[in-house]
Amino acid sequence: MNRSKTFGKIRKRLEEAKNKWARLCKVEYSYNESARLATDALLDGGVEDYEKVLNEEGEVDFLSGDEIQYIMKNIKEPMYSNDNQTEGECGSAANGNKSECFYPMNSDKSEPVSTLHNWSAEEKPYLKDKSSATVYFQTDKTNNVRETIRRCIHRTTQVLAILMDEFTDAEIFCDVLEAANKRNIFVYLLLDANKLHLFTQMCEKLQVRDLHMKNISVRSVTGDVYCAKSGKKFAGQIHEKFIISDWRCVLSGSYSFTWLSGQVHRNFLYKFSGVVVELFDEEFRHLYGSSKPVMGLKSPAPMAPVLRREDSGVSVMTDSTPESVNTTSEPFSSTSTASISNDSQRPKSPESTDPVLASPPRSPVRSPLQRMNSLHGYPSLISPPPQSNYQPNYYQRNYAPDSPSSFFNNNANIYRSFRMRQDDFSTPRFNQGWSLFSRSTMT
């Protein structure tokens, strides 16, 4: 009987588990060197070298056929040329990068640089709600998983953060577009890089372009990276799936944004609120900091402050489905005094009297997460900004000069993006005036 001189870690445990009379040993959770050597051989030489190392180490074949195929398909060559690699170096790049070897002390705790606002204990919105957890299963027809996700999107009033492995559901995509374009909700979408092409194909079939996604930031992210000593490496996939609504409610589970997941696949969904949302908040910050922007899809436009009433906010946990508090009245949708603004009240630019020729002042370039921080990080406004600082080509709320500014100071942390209406310059103006505290009169 031919037996290997040495037993690998997995093979040794397997033989002991199959032997009824073998003594029960303590389970080891330490690092498996034989598995690392075999994986490095697979990256460097292919399947034959992988099997050769397994025989030499006396280890079992621990990778399935699909896993081997995935690794071979996603191998990336090192950044440097093989001619520049000197003998004895362990992945040292010619461009001055550090070693490509895996050092747990340096890589396990490494955090990407993030520009997110760090909330204090008083500012964290998820601390305002009571901690709760609810589970939904696909078999529960009264609480459908797909409809629960769609209701969460419709009840969001400020920010929607989505981490998803696959996004091809056109109906859910319409919900996201409606939230961003109609209710001025800022959407931050992280997708798995390996399945990003499915999302872009859906956008092409639906004829969705950059101009339709001005309030949506789409970025791609990968899983952890395995790197061999030779410098070859491959990245994993994103199997985490969750939605953060207004940083107060989280939906997480096995559900993917696909038609099959909503119709035939078995899935479950968790709904969290309270302190546990902080863990999802930290994970999203970490992944967003290591993500890459998707080519062809722009980030949300710069935001300007819009004041709102204290009692106008709506919690995500309620059963009603109102519009976002960031949404202003559409000037062409109604002839009421609350939705029509006078041309004389529209802000004018001191440099030019022609609104078409006047160029809006440039705002500083800020990342999407910096703009998202402004939802929670800015102090209350003392008074409305002067009209001379407004951009003349955009619609936003006008402030009555005699309105008490202290009425808004307690809740002024909502920021929305400017909107340009090019068709307004060819449309006759309404002459009926509008005031913030005006009341309709009966005639």
UniProtKB/Swiss-Prot annotation:
Pfam families: SACK1
Low complexity: compositionally biased ranges: 327-344, 388-399
Stretches for region Disordered: 311-403
KW Cytoplasm (keyword) present: yes
GO molecular function, one term: protein kinase binding
Annotated SUPFAM superfamilies: Phospholipase D/nuclease
Localization, UniProt: Cytoplasm
Known function: May function in the epidermal growth factor receptor/EGFR signaling pathway.
Designated name of the protein: Protein FAM83A
